[in-house]
């Protein structure tokens, strides 16, 4: 085997690369992943090889997918100049951020939990640091990213909307090297090299943040009201990623990977003290000459942990047959604690009148863990066939917990007798409530797929996946056909189409309240079935002059068995079974996507645009939300436009300059805000008798002409005034847009390569509203917007050694 053929074999079998070799006289031959005989001969002069983590280009049967390289991640301007894996995906078609500046992704109208995100083939449940500002992946450890938003191959399943496959770079088997990065928000260190040359390698990366040391003092000077930063000043994270690879022989390889990430978010206690002393005031009545003391304190503490460990064995039984087996463990834990204290004391000059002390603590915990075993075989019996087949087993454990403790004591003067004797009444109590539930979801699946070429112009990927979900007392089966097709309409134009059915056994409950959002993970039950989706897509891929590629796609997606909170449900109703708080419904989304990209040359970049709609409806018997009327999903954004352009300059043999400009526009996100006040007895007259005795958390249905279901916040002998909404997700925040610039100077020298990058986020200082809260203006309650990302310059330094 020649050296060139050995390189081809290694790349093709290692991870699905695509190679195009150009030789003399302009002749070329393209080879797709796992389809090329190792013994092929190419007579070449000077060779230039272009490779990527996955090839989803013109000649691939795959559509609705994109591959992102580490270089693209580094060139994407982001807040505080922090390279981010998921934020680079947000600039591709069909992908939207949760809010401005955050790393979470929503794909083709789907929800956050509908993304199957893997690290080296193993699932990870929480992919964010710092309340979503930073993704959980260390960019220095990433080999490549593949995002599927439709046309899913049969080897993927268990989520409805997307698959994000993040590959970790293996260590170098021959030499040591590393990378040190210093930024405004965090620092990173990555080291790789051989443990046993040519046999065992390692790759180790670590990150730590220091928001309060550099970023916060800068923001204090920028913000018009620095009090808005109090929720971030005790926020931080760190993570470690490690990969070990051992080659037993040329045919067998074992990889071990470990990831651990930790976040903390401890708000500074908010205190309020008020003292009023009227005992010596000559202008008040004698019974008003009292000294009042009132103290209130409130604090929030939260932390979350991610742990992922996997063993991955690869065996080549022949150049055409490969077996992959992966054993993994993934766990996510979230802790949230509210602490509220009240102390009141009243006295006059002679005696104590009233003393009250109360402490309330609320705690919420979520634990998700999964053990999974997957195995699949790849077989290329012919040059125009690539067969895959595999099985997977997994067991998920979901354990949500909620607890409330309340301790109070009260002493009150009730009587003063004629002789001046005092009689006090006292009351004290301790209340503790805790609810916990364990759910276990077992999943079995098997698949088969074939990527083949019936004839020259037509290429197909046909597959079938069978999946079984099982919880206590209930089992569901989902047959899932998959088909993707590519038809060449000339040498530079291809028509593509796809269909995929997907299913999902876990749900994420989300409050759509823009003022106070919340979430909770739960498994399907006998009453709440697994979610399903069917998606069709049609598109054109074109190869254009000047190294340009163009992709245009339209899609339609049907969603079934979605769940959502019923109207008016509060996220902290800990004493109510979550099954009684939710409704089951359906949804659909559709849109048009465009992407223009240039990867070669000194001028590179991409342009993407998405027009889309996403709607939900809950109108089944006993599952009515929003009066049964269709409403927009929280993930509905009509327009999403991104353009990123990078110009490379070779200033000298050792100096290089890269200038990057990126502009983004996104329609504002939707949410629900209580904007309708109901005052008794107007709407209650009809149900006055039935309303009597209603307790907090119950629902009251009003006459048909009202066509609403209202939620009662407080009830005494008669209903009190309260707020509600007319429709779900009718409030739309203003559109978000910003221009970001980055200039990176790099210098090569005998000790490695150093780079200094200056980034400016939001150049024209657009006030982009990410959230709203209730404030006051002239004693009137009004909605105020939070704009956390103003004009923000940052500096970072990187050294490769």
What are these regions (language model features)?
Residues 183-208, 223-270, 301-323, 387:
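Transmembrane beta-barrel wall of Gram-negative outer-membrane proteins
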Residues 366, 370-372, 435, 525, ...:
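Outer membrane beta-barrel strand-and-loop segments of large Gram-negative receptors
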Residues 556-558, 580-673, 798:
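Gram-negative outer-membrane beta-barrel transporters
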Residues 132-135, 143-153, 162-193, 201-208, ...:
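Short strand-turn segments of transmembrane beta-barrel domains in outer membranes
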Residues 245-263, 299-472, 488:
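Face-selective signature of the C-terminal outer-membrane beta-barrel domain
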Residues 491-536, 556-579, 620, 662-674, ...:
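Surface-exposed extracellular loop regions of Gram-negative outer-membrane beta-barrel proteins
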Residues 29-36, 46-50, 60-113, 121-140, ...:
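Periplasmic N-terminal accessory/gating domains of Gram-negative outer-membrane beta-barrel systems
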Residues 664-719, 734-740, 745-801:
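C-terminal beta-signal and adjacent terminal beta-strands/loops
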């Amino acid at each position: 085997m020649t050296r060139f053929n050995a390189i081809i074999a290694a790349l093709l079998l290692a991870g699905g690369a695509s190679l195009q070799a150009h030789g003399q006289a302009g002749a070329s031959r393209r080879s797709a992943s796992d389809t090329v005989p190792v013994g092929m001969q190419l007579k070449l002069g000077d060779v230039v090889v272009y490779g990527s983590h996955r090839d989803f280009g013109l000649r691939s049967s795959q559509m609705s997918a994109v591959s992102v390289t580490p270089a693209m991640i580094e060139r994407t301007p982001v807040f505080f100049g922090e390279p981010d894996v998921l934020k680079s995906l947000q600039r591709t078609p069909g992908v939207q951020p949760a809010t401005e500046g955050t790393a979470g992704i929503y794909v083709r109208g789907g929800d956050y939990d509908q993304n199957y995100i893997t690290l080296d083939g193993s699932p990870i449940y929480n992919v964010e640091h710092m309340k979503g500002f930073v993704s959980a992946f260390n960019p220095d450890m990433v080999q490549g990213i593949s995002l599927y938003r439709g046309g899913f191959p049969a080897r993927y399943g268990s989520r409805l909307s997307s698959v994000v496959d993040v590959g970790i770079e293996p260590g170098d088997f021959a030499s040591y090297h590393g990378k040190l990065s210093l930024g405004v928000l965090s620092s990173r260190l990555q080291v790789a090299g051989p443990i046993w040359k040519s046999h065992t390698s390692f790759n180790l990366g670590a990150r730590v943040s220091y928001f309060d040391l550099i970023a916060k003092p800068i923001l204090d000077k920028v913000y018009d009201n620095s009090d808005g930063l109090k929720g971030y000043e005790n926020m931080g994270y760190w993570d470690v990623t490690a990969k070990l690879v051992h080659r037993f022989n040329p045919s067998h390889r074992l990889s071990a990977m470990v990831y651990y990430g930790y976040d903390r978010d401890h708000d500074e206690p908010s205190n309020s003290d008020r003292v009023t002393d009227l005992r010596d005031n000559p202008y008040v009545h004698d019974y008003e000459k009292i000294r009042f003391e009132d103290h209130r304190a409130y604090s929030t503490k939260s932390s979350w942990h991610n742990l992922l460990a996997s063993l991955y064995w690869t065996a080549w039984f022949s150049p055409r047959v490969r077996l992959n087996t992966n054993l993994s463990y993934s766990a996510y834990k979230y802790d949230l604690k509210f602490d509220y204290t009240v102390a009141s004391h009243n006295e006059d000059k002679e005696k104590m009148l009233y003393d009250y002390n109360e402490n309330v603590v609320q705690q919420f915990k979520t634990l998700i863990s999964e053990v999974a075993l997957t195995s699949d075989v790849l077989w290329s019996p012919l040059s125009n066939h690539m067969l895959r087949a595999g099985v997977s087993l997994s067991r998920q454990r979901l354990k949500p917990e909620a607890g409330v403790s309340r301790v109070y004591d009260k002493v009150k003067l009730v009587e003063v007798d004629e002789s001046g004797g005092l009689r006090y009444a006292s009351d004290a109590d301790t209340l503790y409530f805790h609810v916990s539930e364990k759910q276990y979801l077992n999943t079995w699946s098997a698949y088969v797929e074939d990527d083949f070429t019936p004839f020259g112009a037509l290429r197909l990927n046909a597959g079938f996946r069978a999946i079984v979900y099982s919880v206590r007392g209930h089992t569901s089966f989902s047959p899932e056909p998959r088909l993707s097709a590519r038809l060449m309409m000339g040498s530079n134009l291809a028509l593509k189409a796809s269909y995929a059915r997907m299913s999902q056994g876990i749900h994420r409950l989300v409050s759509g309240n823009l003022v106070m959002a919340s979430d909770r993970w739960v498994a399907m039950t006998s009453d709440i079935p697994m979610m399903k989706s069917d998606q069709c897509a049609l598109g054109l891929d074109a190869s254009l002059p000047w190294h340009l590629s163009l992709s245009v796609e339209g899609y339609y997606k049907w969603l079934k068995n979605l769940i959502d909170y019923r109207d008016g449900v509060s996220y902290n109703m800990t004493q109510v079974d979550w099954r009684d708080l939710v409704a089951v419904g359906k949804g659909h989304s559709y849109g048009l996507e465009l992407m223009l990209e240039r990867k070669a040359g000194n001028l590179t970049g991409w342009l993407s645009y998405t027009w889309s709609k996403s709607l939900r409806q809950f109108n089944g018997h006993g599952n009515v939300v929003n009066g049964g009327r269709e409403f927009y999903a929280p993930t509905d954004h009509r327009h999403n436009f991104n353009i990123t352009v990078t110009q490379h300059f070779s200033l000298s043999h050792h100096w290089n300059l890269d200038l990057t400009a990126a502009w983004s526009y996104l329609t504002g996100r939707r949410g629900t805000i209580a904007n309708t006040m109901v005052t008794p007895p107007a709407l209650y007259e009809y149900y006055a008798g039935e309303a009597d005795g209603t307790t907090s958390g119950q629902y009251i249905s009003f006459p048909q002409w009202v066509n609403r279901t209202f939620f009662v916040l407080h009830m005494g002998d008669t209903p009190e005034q309260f707020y509600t909404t007319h429709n779900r997700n009718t409030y739309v925040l203003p559109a978000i847009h910003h221009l970001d610039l980055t200039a990176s100077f790099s210098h090569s020298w005998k000790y490695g390569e150093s780079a200094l990058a200056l980034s400016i986020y939001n150049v024209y200082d657009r006030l982009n509203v990410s959230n709203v809260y209730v404030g006051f203006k002239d004693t009137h309650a009004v909605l105020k917007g939070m704009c956390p990302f103003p004009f923000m310059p940052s500096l970072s330094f990187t050294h490769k050694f």
